[in-house]
């Protein structure tokens, strides 16, 4: 496997470290860097990622590592830990390197098995998802006992340094949360209905930022922006596949289904094709979850093309829940204010409207 120059540089910078963070922009190949580092440490590997990425991680390890090894106990094998069978096979595997992949939401529910792991490498894909140290999944991950840690994220804090402490803790920087907040974050108090709340100062939120970044690099963090990597192709295409739902397959078989109190009847070739597309769009939990995970994984400006109004409304709800400003271009309106003013905006464009 041949890595890009910037990926080789990231590995070279951290070659002597066993706790590292690769904060690389989307499209720079964090998966390749993280996997290469993990395999070089020669330990069992536990990967925690978004649910939609489990198959991608398994495919990556089989394609670039396992399929090129001997199929015996001196090699490696990768297991999906979301099933009881996969977890049991992982725990009792006799391969030299056991690789287990599990999603954040399920990991903390597998405490009995995972808290007993020792002498392993923990790799967190989209490590920004543990920034809320009060959440169950974050608390659990901080309880694990890995020998090595690899953090992967394009937006480790979304620019909010007050959310960085959990990742700092995993990198081995021995600073308490209280001291960290006093040294690097400017807090202010506000009165809300007689209750005093502490919030980050809006005008001057952070302090000692240069020292903070220096300490992060000292503890294995590599920051890399797209514009710094001149050897990249001009465009990077990333295909994200999602499975078709059981409702889709039932409709394709029977040509009729009731979903969300609405009956879809494919009594002609045209209506069947139309409803099939809707079942893969606004009615697809898999596709909407993949969209949510994409938005969570980056603070870049996003442009999303859509077909149906119901599909747009479902995605807008997700964007609002995640606090992302939106713009819209369709047959009824053209509002680009947030696109022009907010660098983390999401612009929704209806296909036909986008052509005009």
Where are these regions (language model features)?
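Interdomain linker/hinge connecting the two RecA-like lobes of the SF2 helicase core
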Residues: 18-21, 127, 133-134, 164-168, ...
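Conserved Walker A/P-loop ATP-binding site and its immediately adjacent core
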Residues: 33-36, 42-63, 158-163, 306-312
């Amino acid at each position: 496997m041949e890595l890009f120059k910037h990926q080789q540089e990231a590995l070279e910078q951290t070659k002597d470290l066993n706790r590292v963070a690769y904060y690389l922009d989307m499209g720079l190949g964090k998966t390749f860097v993280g996997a290469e580092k993990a395999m070089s440490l020669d330990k069992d590997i536990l990967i925690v990622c978004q649910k939609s990425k489990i198959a991608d991680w398994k495919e990556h390890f089989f394609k670039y590592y396992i399929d090129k090894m001997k199929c015996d106990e001196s090699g490696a094998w990768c297991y999906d830990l979301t099933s009881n069978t996969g977890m049991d096979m992982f725990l009792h595997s006799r391969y030299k390197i056991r690789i287990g992949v599990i999603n954040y939401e399920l990991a903390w529910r597998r405490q009995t098995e995972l808290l007993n792991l020792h002498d392993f490498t923990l790799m967190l894909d989209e490590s920004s998802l543990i920034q809320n140290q009060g959440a169950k999944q974050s608390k659990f991950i901080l309880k694990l006992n890995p020998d090595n840690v690899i953090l992967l994220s394009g937006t480790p804090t979304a620019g909010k340094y007050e959310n960085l402490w959990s990742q700092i803790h995993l990198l081995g920087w021995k600073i308490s949360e209280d001291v960290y907040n006093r040294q690097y974050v400017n807090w202010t108090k506000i009165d809300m209905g007689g209750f005093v709340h502490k919030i980050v100062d809006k005008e001057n939120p952070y302090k000692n930022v240069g020292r903070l970044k220096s300490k992060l690099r000292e503890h294995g963090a590599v920051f890399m922006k797209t514009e710094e990597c001149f050897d990249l192709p001009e465009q990077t295409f990333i295909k994200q596949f999602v499975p078709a739902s059981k409702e889709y397959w039932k409709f394709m078989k029977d040509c009729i289904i009731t979903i969300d109190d609405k009956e879809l009847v494919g009594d002609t070739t045209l209506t069947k094709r139309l409803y099939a597309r809707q079942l893969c769009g606004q009615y697809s939990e898999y596709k909407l979850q993949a969209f949510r995970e994409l938005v969570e994984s980056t603070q870049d400006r996003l442009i999303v093309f859509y077909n149906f109004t119901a599909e747009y409304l479902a995605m807008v709800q997700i964007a609002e829940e995640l606090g992302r400003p939106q713009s819209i271009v369709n047959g009824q309106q053209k509002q680009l204010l947030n696109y022009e003013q907010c660098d983390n905006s999401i612009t929704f464009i209806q296909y036909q409207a986008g052509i005009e």
